[in-house]
Amino acid sequence: MKVLVGTASWSDKSLVASKKFYPREASTPEARLRFYATRFPLVEIDTSYYAIPLAQTSQAWADRTPGHFAFNIKAFRLFTGHATSPRVLPPDLRAELPPLKKENFYFRDVPPELRRALWDRFKEALEPLRASGKLGMVHFQFAPWLLRNKSGLAHVELCVEAMAGYTVSVEFRNKTWFDDAHLGQTLAFERALNVVHTVVDGPQGFHNTVPPVWESTHMNYSLVRLHGRNQETWNIKGATVASERFDYDYSDA
């Protein structure tokens, strides 16, 4: 068994600001990635959740890392059911959006032909990593309001079908997926789709947290994501970046 350990992003604001990891000369994103890859064999790309990266960008990531290095990449937020601003779409595809009544839109608001174009653009962004053998999992962190019901199951199936040929990992943020009545069914559903179940270690007691379910649903891979035990900041209002919600500097107690 081989275990790969990494962080979510090599340029996380708190990681850079701590000045405890990167040497002084690693002052650019390129230099930080090159240094990071000498310390860890894996990283999770977080920026792809906020906007679909350019293929040139992912090619640069592949070029700046050694052959054994792996990238897990988060799926674009529109695909996972989160509110999305038109501003983050590629300009040519943004023009294909129908008129919107609100500032943000959701996957359900997107016409089928534009959905296909967005999936294609996302996979184009992954191709340099895939071609170099450095693409790990494509991680779908679904929105907290994605319930385990008919429409929720159908949306997960749609995403997995759209990413056929890729190793897909799924993370649910709603308790209906793992309550006593549905835990076994959810794991069976994940196994039937051949997706990687995500073991989530995070604070408990919130509407958007789930218990850690230590099960494996994929023949080759398992995934554990450590979100910390940060009760006070988990749902902090006004956070502009994910790092504002996390605190990993714990006392020995």
Annotated model-derived regions:
Residues 1-253:
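Residues lining hydrophobic/aromatic ligand-binding pockets adjacent to catalytic sites
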